[in-house]
Regions:
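Multi-pass membrane proteins that catalyze or facilitate reactions on polyprenyl-/lipid-phosphate substrates
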Residues: 1-309
Length: 309
């Protein structure tokens, strides 16, 4: 039974990690209705660890899919074209290289990682300095905060898309190579809001920030996905260290839950990522996600504040 629960958690994570609907909110809500068979003294600490570590499986799927753009090294072969960068639908461009003997270094990948590192600075500082303090205040009202943030961010998505349509604003940044370090830093600050307030959605916050800063939808999504790699890896490491520091040790059953959930999230993510990239590349907007968030948030508030009271 625990394995089946772990598979369900993995499916939910694999789908929602790549949509701006807050995967953490979905996992927390699922845990409210479908709990693992854990001892009371370990349940809270384990689920806090679980909700972060399970995301590593999903992130690994994206690393494999986008490996060619993320990995900056290769073998020097034919001379790379130095002509003007070619624009593509999904925000990826031609990649000139530096050659060092037999080693070739892709310029765009190096510059992308520099911008990712800059965007990670706010989240790193938050995780080290404020994470525990903020969690102390938000834990008691977690489901209420989730409901409110699902609705608020959903409304922001609708407003941003309406603004783009009414003003017929064309994106200023249509390629990842055109993304400035200042823009990357602001997007990184948006991540902190998501880290502090459950239900915000890390991808939702960064995509909204990107759209407001003039990024095209494909570029906003691509950078959001790229940024998830070090962000979630770092968050998982931080949670694991805290778990160990508190003297807790994973049992065989808990380790099985983590592995099964992560592997499931990994497999499901291949489908979810591909569908999301196809959806955005066809110039579709984020209104459906905004509407979904509002409906889910309203349902959460109705249940926990009125029905469950």
């Amino acid at each position: 039974m625990e394995v089946l629960k772990a598979i369900l958690y993995g499916i939910i994570e694999g789908i929602t990690e790549w949509l701006p609907v807050s995967s953490t909110a979905h996992l927390i809500l699922l845990h409210e209705w479908l709990k693992f068979d854990l001892t009371p003294e370990k349940e809270e600490a384990f689920m806090e660890l679980f909700n972060v570590v399970i995301q590593l499986g999903a992130i690994l799927a994206f690393v494999i899919i986008d490996w060619k753009n993320l990995w900056p090294f290769g073998l020097a072969g034919k001379k790379e074209s130095t002509k003007k960068t070619k624009k593509t639908k999904n925000g990826v461009s031609a990649d000139p290289r530096w050659s060092f003997g037999a080693l070739a270094v892709k310029q765009n990948s190096i510059f992308l990682w520099i911008k990712i590192a800059i965007a990670c600075i706010p989240g790193f500082l938050y995780g080290i300095l404020l994470d525990d303090t903020v969690e102390t205040y938000t834990d008691a009202y977690k489901t209420t905060i989730i409901g409110i943030m699902l609705i608020l961010v959903g409304l922001v998505f609708l407003l941003v898309e309406h603004r783009i349509k009414v003003k017929e604003k064309k994106p200023k940044v249509k390629l990842l190579t055109e993304l400035s370090w200042q823009t990357a830093l602001i997007i990184g600050l948006a991540q902190v809001i998501a880290a502090a307030l459950p239900g915000t959605s890390r991808s939702g916050a960064t995509i909204i920030a990107g759209l407001l800063l003039g990024l095209s939808r494909p570029v906003a999504v691509r950078f959001t996905f790229d940024l998830a790699v070090p962000t979630m890896a770092g968050a998982s490491l931080l949670k694991l260290l805290k778990y160990i520091k508190n003297g807790l040790v994973l049992s065989g059953g808990e380790l099985t839950i983590l592995i099964v959930s992560s592997v499931t999230a990994f497999l499901v993510s291949f489908i979810a990522i591909s569908l999301m990239i196809i959806y955005i590349s066809r110039n579709k907007d984020f209104k459906p996600f905004g509407i979904y968030r509002i409906l889910l948030g309203a349902g959460v508030l109705l249940y926990y504040l009125v029905i469950a009271g």
